[in-house]
Regions:
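N-terminal Sec/SRP start-transfer signal
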Residues: 242-279
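Conserved small/polar residues in nucleotide/adenosyl-binding loops
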Residues: 283-284
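Conserved catalytic segment of ABC-fold P-loop ATPases
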Residues: 209-215
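ABC-family P-loop ATPase nucleotide-binding domain
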Residues: 1-13, 222-256
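ABC family nucleotide-binding domain
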Residues: 3-207
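Short, function-defining helix-loop hinge/capping sites that tune catalysis or transport
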Residues: 113, 211, 276-277
Length: 284
């Protein structure tokens, strides 16, 4: 089998005063399409840094990371953003939903930045929310949703551009046991549909539901069992195809981003006013 994600001798260090603190110390790891993997470790073990590198949110100090055979170090900023946008979906413990957008609008956000036309975005967002049992909550704002419902919205958002690889950082950490079980059931369904699911957790009960549990300690992998071979793993759903021309894609994306920015300002009128006053005082 050829790995979907391949890390070779990955190291990551950060400056701390006059010294360099090494957080990851020579990580080598292969993850295959269709796997459900848990990465476990104590706080400050390096598991979150590893997740950020896997999701192309951070770059290694040294070593090689390949996604579907592509060395990410050879990509410029735009190409890296495209790779991240088209291949990865992120699920966070605290959901990270935009409070001024409805559930449907939150799900649409990744496709806005991908330049997908509004009609296509709307149809796909509605389809995903319906699949996750939220067809009657599309116009609700995050504050009107339970924690479990907010996490389902974030899962739909992660799938908006295809989500070949789902990276879930403590996905049940902020949920009660019933909602946590529902979220894990959804992640299992995604794995069954061919998605590659990577869960970062400190909860042994959550980790036990994965096919492979990788343990990291002090920046090093201390346990990494062999992968379970998959038959006909497809690597997730097909990415959404954008039929718009390059210029139309740019205009559509710019207009939608501007609209979202305006909504954010309108939703935080007092903060916006204070910011404007602060800027005015600076120039007096």
């Amino acid at each position: 089998m050829t790995p979907l994600l391949e890390l070779k001798d990955i190291r990551r260090s950060y400056p701390a005063g006059d010294e360099q603190v090494e957080v990851l110390k020579g990580i080598s790891l292969d993850i295959y399409a269709g796997e459900m993997v848990a990465i476990v470790g104590a706080s400050r073990s390096g598991k979150s840094t590893l997740m950020n590198i896997l999701g192309c949110l951070d770059k290694a100090t040294s070593g090689t990371y390949r996604v579907a055979g592509q060395d990410v170090a050879t990509l410029d900023a735009d190409a890296l953003a495209q790779l991240r946008r088209e291949h990865f979906g992120f699920i966070f413990q605290r959901y990270h939903l935009l409070s001024h957008l409805t559930a449907e609008q939150n799900v649409e956000v990744p496709a806005v930045y991908a330049g997908l036309e509004r009609k296509q975005r709307l149809l796909r967002a509605q389809e995903l929310l319906q699949r996750l049992g939220l067809e009657d909550r599309t116009e609700y704002y995050p504050a009107q949703l339970s924690g479990g419902q907010q996490q389902r919205v974030s899962i739909a958002r992660a799938l908006m551009n295809g989500g070949q690889v789902i990276l879930a950082d403590e996905p049940t950490g902020a949920l009660d046991s019933h909602s946590g079980e529902e979220v894990m059931a959804i992640l299992h369904q995604l794995r069954d549909r061919g998605h590659t699911v990577i869960i970062v957790t400190h909860d042994p009960q959550v980790a036990a539901q994965a096919e492979r549990v990788i343990e990291i300690r002090d920046g090093e992998i201390v346990h990494n069992p062999p992968a379970v071979e998959k038959v006909n793993a497809t690597g997730g759903t097909e990415p959404v195809v954008n039929t718009a021309s390059g210029w139309r894609q740019f205009v559509s994306g710019f207009n939608e981003a501007l609209t979202m920015a305006w909504r954010a300002l309108a939703a935080n009128k007092m903060r916006t006013l204070l910011t404007m006053l602060g800027l005015s005082l600076i120039h007096i």
